[in-house]
Amino acid sequence: MNALQRLYWYYKLKGSPYRPLFASVQKGEYVSLDCETTSLDPNRAELVTIAATKIIDNRIITSQPFEVRLRAPQSLDSNSIKIHQIRHQDLADGIDEKQALIRLLNFVGNRPLVGYHIRYDKKILDLACKRHLGFPLPNPLIEVSQIYHDKLERHLPNAYFDLSLDAICKHLDLPQQKNKHDALQDAISAALVFVRLTKGDLPSLNLPYTR
């Protein structure tokens, strides 16, 4: 969302509790976010879980995470269950989508969103927010795989880089995920990559897969 769009929504939401979302972005604070959904197509996907963790002054606040499970959507089928291992019975106590979004906005505020394939998550959340609340998320996006690629590309132009989250974490000597396709684990992994790449040393350039 550009500055003009942000200003438009800021004035349109006068008197709304959501107006501060479109004010100036907080500096030094970020939120790493991930969603589990029912499809890889953002126009068809429905939310299953949403998880996030704050990054404040380069510290990942894992002691106060955000995590919600939604009611099982109609499109939750065997194909999506194979990916994230979340079944209908696992969502028996899930909350409705609008309530989940309200909780998420209270947690995130207008902080930039960090993530792995974060544009996919943002697209789905935008569609849901427009449907229930009437506006898209204003949050700037930070893609950790792009930061990783750009840092290495400057020193190893035309090399091949494995941009999977597991490969990035392994190369950066970060903890490997125990549960793949777990929203909170993915959010924490993306946060670790972000802090490592923005505040740590340059990653090792001795890559077995460069060419």
Q: Where on the chain are the PLM-derived regions?
A:
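Active-site catalytic pocket residues across diverse enzymes, especially alpha/beta-hydrolases
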Residues: 129-132, 197, 201
